[in-house]
Amino acid sequence: MLTILKTGQSAHKVPPEKVQATYGRYRIQALLSVFLGYLAYYIVRNNFTLSTPYLKEQLDLSATQIGLLSSCMLIAYGISKGVMSSLADKASPKVFMACGLVLCAIVNVGLGFSSAFWIFAALVVFNGLFQGMGVGPSFITIANWFPRRERGRVGAFWNISHNVGGGIVAPIVGAAFAILGSEHWQSASYIVPACVAVIF
């Protein structure tokens, strides 16, 4: 495991009288971090679906090729969730999750400059693999900060990030198309969502 991904040591000791308040504040911060982080993962995953009409019109890809691209990403993502979650156990969840999101954004920028089918296929596979770096750290963070009796409620709240992230992709891409125009469909579909996801 790379040193940068390892969990760091605590930088300072908290005075006993402030432990309870500090703990409460930190665990809310931890929950919001994984909520917003996983929300951002969806921005650079579901944006691909919105680009499919342009893949057909502008790059002359067939429905079969587009379906294959979607399948490649989802299969890679499914495999990656198991592998990456195991690796996340040995890493700092915060750093691991952030690295995965940045890598997904980089792949999306690559999609914004690609036109060949096999390059697209390779990039969507990489996107699927890096997408798997989001779920493990989220579960680990929730388990580390919340007792078993609270995890159902906390997990339900975190799960909303899937819907919020998936729901805001269309407005983001739509606004990008309105500003940039359909001639810049790759930037609107891939590069703008990548930038928004990293800002999150």
Say what each PLM segment does.
Residues N46, L74-G82, G167:
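Residue-level signature of mid-helix packing/kink "hotspots" within the transmembrane helices
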Residues Q29-A63:
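Extracytoplasmic
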Residues Y42, N46, G112, G128-G136, ...:
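Small-residue-rich segments within alpha-helical transmembrane domains of MFS-like 12-TM solute carriers
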Residues A116-V124:
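Short hydrophobic/alpha-helical segments at membrane-entry points of transmembrane helices
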Residues I79-F117:
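Conserved MFS/SLC helix-loop-helix module at the cytosolic interface between two early adjacent transmembrane helices
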Residues W158-F200:
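Helix-loop-helix hairpin linking two adjacent transmembrane segments in secondary transporters
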Residues L123-I160:
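Cytoplasmic helix-loop-helix junction between adjacent transmembrane helices
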